[in-house]
Amino acid sequence: MTTDASNKSIKDVLRVYRQSRISAPIVYDSPHSGIINPPDFRPTATDSQLKTARDAFVDELIIDSSNLGAAVLVADFPRTYIDPNRSKSEVDISIINGKWPHDVEVTKKLDVGMGLIRKYILPNVPMYSKKLTVSEVENRIKNYWSPYHQSLQNLLEEKLSEFGSIFYINWHSMKSKGNQ
């Protein structure tokens, strides 16, 4: 199966897999499997530290379910760049150089540095050596977070319209032990 504009994939941002000949009331997404670093992603965290945040190979586990009629959405960008599983208002203003002009939602994840854009890659290990600009954060939301959410919304609405009810599973992996 191809992943081109005909099924709404966006190069280096997201992939959508689905069959046109068979359909099932299932939508899967893998928001944390991405490994394609955007050109403006310049963390001070090491590659091995960045890999700790990835749900490695989860996308590979679920892609073939599209052959049975499921719609599958995969993020190609890393969650360490911007996390599609966070609210776009879950912004840590302490990592931004300038005044953030949008609403902010304070959550437990944000409090530990793991909001929409991470402050820490691991507990007390900074992600960046300098603050991000307001426009950098806004561009991440516009070019990565929003298209991912729009694609997910479109898939959910299409399947719901077709079947009346659906199964939606947001796929992740877990470490056998925490960040040690």
Regions flagged by a language model, labelled:
Residues 2-168, 174-180:
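N-terminal catalytic or cofactor-binding beta/alpha core of small enzyme domains
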